[in-house]
Amino acid sequence: MNPFHSSCWNTSAELSNKSWNKEFAYQTASVVDTVILPSMIGIICSTGLVGNILIVFTIIRSRKKTVPDIYICNLAVADLVHIIGMPFLIHQWARGGEWVFGGPLCTIITSLDTCNQFACSAIMTVMSVDRYFALVQPFRLTSWRTRYKTIRINLGLWAASFVLALPVWIYSKVIKFKDGVESCAFDLTSPDDVLWYTLYLTITTFFFPLPLILVCYILILCYTWEMYQQNKDARCCNPSVPKQRVMKLTKMVLVLVAVFILSAAPYHVIQLVNLQMEQPTLAFYVGYYLSICLSYASSSINPFLYILLSGNFQKRLPQIQRRVTDKEIKNMGNTLKSHF
């Protein structure tokens, strides 16, 4: 999620510019904005960075990469892109909304963060469709479910995400607000522009992909229940029932989708509510920052879900560790030999 965005929902400076003049509420929000929130985001940043690098490293070093591995690797890369912008966000919040890194970096960080939003939603949607065909229609679209074509599909999704984020590349800049604070924000001066952009971002990154994701997994659950009933009635092993490995992968993606909904829904609801508010209340302010924390927390939680829910990752990590250790021992032996 992009807290750098539009002038109507960027930082505490922007929200206070909407004539929110209650002294206690403002002081409370200021403490949250400059102390508590940067600390929380910093913890999320450090754990998410380690976890996602571990996932990407594990998949890249794996000898047998599966189609789901490619999607998971791209989601981990997207989470890393999300995390890269965190230190800049922390710095801006800690300084009361002031941006000191210049206009070009403001545009790059804001645009990459938005591109990441589009990419995460698109990859999650396509991965859900892939799980549906792998489980319910295993003999359809098999030519498209190869590793090579899956890589091309993911590259296409990233390219489309950059195109969809073009408005941010154009309009994100350093803006000087009425209180004199220069912040990195999305320069939308017209209320109509704010309305249309908010709807554009909310629909394309959440409300459009969400039904597709839910439909895929509802169909998967219906199919699984039907196969279970057939086996139970026939009292035999039906070869069409998904294998344990596929079921584990499906369970993993189901949990990831649940995390996607819980982390993204509050943020987008807050944006829609903000369109109707003249003066933000303390409750709105708290909800706004909680939604940002939830959105960034998902980038930290996802890699640990991959490890906990996937038997493949649990097996691969020790194997890769042994391979790396053996390689280091071999290199050390060669180094010692060269000195004697």
Swiss-Prot record:
Keyword tRNA processing: no
SUPFAM superfamilies: Family A G protein-coupled receptor-like
Tissue: Specifically expressed in the brain with highest levels in cerebral cortex, hippocampus and hypothalamus, and lower levels in caudate nucleus, putamen and thalamus.
Major site of localization recorded for this protein: membrane
Membrane topology type: Multi-pass membrane protein
Extracellular side: 1-34, 93-106, 173-198, 273-286
Subcellular location: Cell membrane
Keyword vocabulary terms for this entry: Cell membrane, G-protein coupled receptor, Glycoprotein, Membrane, Receptor, Transducer, Transmembrane, Transmembrane helix
Keyword Translocase attributed: no
GO MF: G protein-coupled peptide receptor activity
Cited CDD domains: 7tmA_MCHR2 (cd15339)
One annotated GO biological process: neuropeptide signaling pathway
Cytoplasmic compartment segments: 58-69, 130-149, 222-252, 310-340
Record field: transmembrane: 35-57, 70-92, 107-129, 150-172, 199-221, 253-272, 287-309
Alphabetized PROSITE patterns for the sequence: G_PROTEIN_RECEP_F1_1, G_PROTEIN_RECEP_F1_2
Pfam families referenced in this protein's UniProt entry, alphabetically: 7tm_1 (PF00001)
Sugar-modified residues: N10, N17
GO cellular-component term (any): plasma membrane
Function: Receptor for melanin-concentrating hormone, coupled to G proteins that activate phosphoinositide hydrolysis.
PANTHER family: MELANIN-CONCENTRATING HORMONE RECEPTOR 2-RELATED, NEUROPEPTIDES RECEPTOR
Family: Belongs to the G-protein coupled receptor 1 family.
Protein name: Melanin-concentrating hormone receptor 2
Gene from which this protein is expressed: MCHR2
